[in-house]
């Protein structure tokens, strides 16, 4: 751990200023991704990559499961399935995913959160800590949350509907006064269609009994870790669904924003 990248200060503004001038950023590590976000938007909901195979490429990440059967969150080599009924359960090694993003998590920026912050404020803090949008950031937050709002897509059946139709019927859950973990990524804007540009985060409670794709949250206290990553490896499927999908629709950015908000 570089001593310049470890902070123990009660003021997030001062911490951000401390790192803002730290410009010689050279993200380490590698992000492994199976399939493309544009494929998921197009309705490619089945993949051949297993959870066991994902863990060969990382110990931290997020994604979904075949047939859109819930959200995926992973940290410390633990992988959980966040179901559409709001529950959470450990994922099985043989389960498969149509889309997932994994990395071996290595934090090079760490700091405590000692004041109440909204999701937007946390994102602004991260943007000041890592001012270049051309790097990937793996983000982990362990904390106490007065509120977290999540959604989880319900399991689908063939013939598959496009993602924008599916999310119209997704259940929304509100967790109050919970300890838990946020795992997510900030991806560069140039990855639109490949990944989710900007912030993409999932949440699970400390009891590992509930969670989902984050729409909003408020954190009271916690610990933020950021790992900067400069390499991306994408493993594209060879299924008929993928090969025949329109992966470059005109509205791809708008579609991703609508599906992932």
From Swiss-Prot:
It comes from the Bacteria. Its EC number is 4.1.1.5. The keyword Lyase applies. It catalyses: (2S)-2-acetolactate + H(+) = (R)-acetoin + CO2. GO terms for molecular function: acetolactate decarboxylase activity. It holds the Pfam family AAL_decarboxy. GO terms for biological process: acetoin biosynthetic process. The keyword DNA damage does not apply. Signal peptide: none annotated. InterPro entries: Acetolactate_a_deCO2ase. Pathway: Polyol metabolism; (R,R)-butane-2,3-diol biosynthesis; (R,R)-butane-2,3-diol from pyruvate: step 2/3. Keywords: Acetoin biosynthesis, Decarboxylase, Lyase. Belongs to the alpha-acetolactate decarboxylase family. Converts acetolactate into acetoin. This is Alpha-acetolactate decarboxylase. It comes from Vibrio cholerae serotype O1 (strain ATCC 39315 / El Tor Inaba N16961).
């Amino acid at each position: 751990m570089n001593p310049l990248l470890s902070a123990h200060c009660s003021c997030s503004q001062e911490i951000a200023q401390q790192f803002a001038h730290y410009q010689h950023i050279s993200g380490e590590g590698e992000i492994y991704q199976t399939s493309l976000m544009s494929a998921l938007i197009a309705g490619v909901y089945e993949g051949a990559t297993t959870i066991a195979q994902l863990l060969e490429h990382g110990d931290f990440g997020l994604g979904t499961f075949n047939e859109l059967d819930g959200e995926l969150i992973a940290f410390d080599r633990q992988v959980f399935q966040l179901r559409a009924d709001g529950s959470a359960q450990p994922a099985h090694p043989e389960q498969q995913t149509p889309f997932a993003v994994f990395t071996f998590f290595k934090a090079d920026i760490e700091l405590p959160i000692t004041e109440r912050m909204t999701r937007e404020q946390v994102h602004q803090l991260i943007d000041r800590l890592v001012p270049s949008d051309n790097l990937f950031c793996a983000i982990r937050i362990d904390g106490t949350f007065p509120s977290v709002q999540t959604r989880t897509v319900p399991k689908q059946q063939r013939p598959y509907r496009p993602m924008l139709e599916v999310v119209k019927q997704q259940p929304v859950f509100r967790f109050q006064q919970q300890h838990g973990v946020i795992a997510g990524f900030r991806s560069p804007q140039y990855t639109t269609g490949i990944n989710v540009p900007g912030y993409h985060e999932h949440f699970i409670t400390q009891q590992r009994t509930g969670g989902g794709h984050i729409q909003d949250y408020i954190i009271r206290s916690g610990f933020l870790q950021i790992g900067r990553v400069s390499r991306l490896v994408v493993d594209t499927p060879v299924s008929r669904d993928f090969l025949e999908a329109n992966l470059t629709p005109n509205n791809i950015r708008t579609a991703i924003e609508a599906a992932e908000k």
